[in-house]
Amino acid sequence: MADCIFCRIAAGTAKAEIVHETPAALAFLDAHPAARGHAMVIPRVHAASLLELEGAAVEGLFLAVKEVMAKVAAALRPAGMNVGWNHGRAAGQHVLHLHVHVLPRYAEGGRGVQRLGEGGDRGALAEVADALRRA
């Protein structure tokens, strides 16, 4: 997709600090890192979300995520890592090409994933669980 910056990075027509490549995916350092070594792993095919990827592409993407995590662990020795992605603009996805963040966390600056709420109402949880099971 010509107007997608991540597709241009994958095609080699836009610059990025590429740190890992596979036939299915590639990883590069985030241009606006939240921590030293913050990388993003993308599928080579354009997909705005995980729901758009076929099985083999999903497998290739997450194998690359694991390999990037191993590289980050070996090279930078963080105390931990956050790994995840934003799905859709309402969730904070700014580039509509699926990208998985590998975010090293260091003892002096790690915040982890912040808790979003308190315990849920058991009845409401059961209702949502039933709806998900039926879907």
Language model features with spans:
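HIT superfamily nucleotide-processing domains
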Residues: 1-135
